[in-house]
């Protein structure tokens, strides 16, 4: 399932324009020099003086609500909510508020995929086609058969971000796999199909068993449930932007009665369930909302939603050395995930496995990832794995980029290069 965006972008548009930021640094990077350590050695909880002005910044950028969470020493230590969850009702953002994580969905799924690698269910350098070859792949593109699991996680698959017409447009590569970065939600969705094929589990069930429950992310979901229905925030377009239908919310509400009729909850749906439900969904929905089975499914690249503190628990889980199997990936896999895999900007930015990496000083790197859904939700996370420190910001406004950048600068003391690329 995909979120909508303005005009022609429709249900897939936000994914075409979604933020491509993502990052995590190696846990065993060389230590910082003393001067550099002092420069960044302070907690990432924003100051009271900054927070006193935050509502003014939110108003300036047309952002109704913000959630912030901070990790220190590998533990969630602070979270705060600001503004309103819904402009019409005036309901305040609180600890239960569920945000659309947007492309922050990708690092979470990457972590689950790496757990499957550790379990021997997947191999990083084996091709996706070895495990599962969807029928929507182009039949005249041999490069599709060379895309590996590693290529997906470091965005070197050569695939596009999203097809504009998936109901009639075969998926084909834009570039040779493994040779450069092509940010691709399609690649993550194909890997999702692979994971569902080899495990026999839906994305949401797989994530819940392998990650959400062990990490304490009890209110997170890739689909829709009663908690999300009660507590989801409502996004607001940026000032002057064309209003956009919030199709994730609209789609899930239309699919709920179909799921009940089919006798299978939405979190348990896999591809064949979506194929079966598509005719009924199309009959119940406005034209163009559901054009192929992928519009009915959870989406590893974009549909995660949850409270800001749940995502901070994920960041803490990634950096906590004592998580241990089956709660976490192995240390060897963790090092591969957080190490440079593909250069983005030589000497400064790299792709890890599911994350982007930004060099801070010497060989030390921070991790970060951004997200954008439907021109209404902007999200960002950044962390310092050497100090096991992290920051998560989620907003329900299309102008949220300007807000989260100011929060990151105020909390970390750093103006990230990624903000200018």
Model region roles, listed by residue range:
Residues 1-13, 17-24:
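N-terminal secretory signal peptides
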Residues 40-99, 121, 164-174:
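Short, conserved catalytic-motif segment at the N-terminal edge
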Residues 60-69, 88-151, 175-186, 299-302, ...:
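Short active-site loop at a secondary-structure junction
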Residues 86, 139-372:
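Short, surface-exposed loop or secondary-structure junction motifs
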Residues 346, 360-364, 394-421:
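Short, gly/Ser/Thr-rich active-site loops of penicillin-recognizing serine hydrolases
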Residues 369-370, 378-397:
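Short, well-ordered beta-strand elements
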């Amino acid at each position: 399932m995909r979120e909508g965006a303005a005009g022609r972008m429709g249900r897939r548009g936000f994914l075409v324009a979604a933020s491509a930021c993502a990052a995590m640094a190696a846990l065993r990077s060389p230590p910082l020099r003393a001067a550099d350590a002092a420069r960044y050695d302070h907690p990432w909880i924003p100051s009271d003086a900054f927070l006193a002005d935050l509502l003014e910044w939110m108003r300036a950028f047309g952002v109704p609500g913000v959630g912030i969470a901070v990790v220190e020493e590998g533990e969630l230590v602070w979270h705060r909510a600001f503004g309103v969850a819904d402009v019409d009702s005036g309901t305040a953002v609180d600890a239960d508020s569920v945000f659309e994580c947007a492309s922050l969905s990708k690092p979470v799924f990457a972590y689950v995929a790496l757990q499957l690698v550790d379990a021997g269910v997947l191999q990083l350098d084996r091709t996706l086609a070895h495990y599962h070859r969807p029928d929507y792949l182009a039949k005249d593109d041999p490069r599709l058969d060379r895309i590996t699991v590693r290529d997906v996680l470091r965005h070197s698959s050569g695939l596009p971000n999203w097809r504009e017409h998936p109901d009639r447009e075969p998926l084909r590569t834009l570039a040779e796999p493994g040779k450069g970065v092509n940010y691709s939600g399609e690649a993550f969705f194909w890997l999702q199909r692979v994971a569902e094929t080899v495990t026999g589990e839906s994305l949401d069930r797989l994530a819940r068993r392998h990650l959400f429950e062990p990490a304490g992310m009890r209110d997170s979901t890739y689909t829709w449930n009663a908690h999300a229905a009660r507590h989801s925030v409502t996004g607001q377009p940026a000032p002057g932007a064309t209003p956009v239908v919030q199709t994730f919310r609209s789609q899930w509400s239309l699919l709920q009665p179909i799921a009940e009729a089919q006798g299978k909850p939405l979190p348990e749906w896999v591809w064949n369930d979506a194929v079966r439900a598509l005719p009924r969904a199309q009959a119940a929905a406005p034209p163009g909302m559901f054009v192929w089975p992928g519009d009915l499914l959870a989406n590893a690249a974009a549909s995660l939603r949850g409270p800001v503190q749940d995502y901070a628990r994920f960041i803490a889980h990634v950096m906590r050395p004592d998580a241990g199997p089956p709660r976490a990936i192995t240390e060897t896999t963790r090092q591969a995930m957080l190490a440079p895999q593909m250069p983005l900007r030589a000497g400064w930015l790299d792709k890890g496995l599911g994350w982007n990496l930004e060099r801070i000083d010497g060989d030390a790197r921070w991790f970060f990832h951004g997200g954008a859904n439907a021109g209404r939700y902007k999200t960002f996370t950044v962390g310092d794995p050497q100090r096991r420190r992290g920051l998560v910001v989620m907003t329900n406004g299309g102008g949220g980029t300007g807000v989260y950048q100011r929060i990151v600068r105020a909390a970390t003391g750093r103006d990230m290069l990624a903000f200018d690329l």
